[in-house]
Amino acid sequence: MRRATSVHAKGTWPQDREVATVTLDFEDRHRRRIRLVDDGGADFLLDLPEATRFGDGDALAVADSGDMIRVIAAAEAVADITAPHIDAAVKLAWHIGNRHTPMQVLPGGGLRIRDDHVLVAMVERLGAEVHRHHAGFSPEAGAYHDGGGAGHHHHLSLIHIS
């Protein structure tokens, strides 16, 4: 059985090495070790050193071959949220974030959450327009996410005041 042992972020892996795709919803894109079936019906073992969140367009590297399995975000029930102006959009984002709800920022400033009737009612009360449909969901990683080890550094500067 093929064994995928590492994750490569979208845009950082050689696309000519793609041998398969695997379509997974948001919940299934946070794994460490599990048997999966690619979109062509072939099984493989995901065997990562630690639980890792992978996104749409990332690749799972197959051990000992250099082959890549591209991850596709499955269409799932989502709610796209738009606001009449930027101040309202910031307020909506704050309210959604205050509920520790995964949220995707869309091009153009819209917001996407997994469809949840309670949250949809809340943002509508706050003046948002909501479009419910099925689409891939790739929320922001969050402020405390390590970014997959892609060169994230903390910097400390000391300021001397005399």
Language-model features: where?
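General beta-strand structural signal in soluble alpha/beta enzymes
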Residues: 71, 105, 113, 130-133
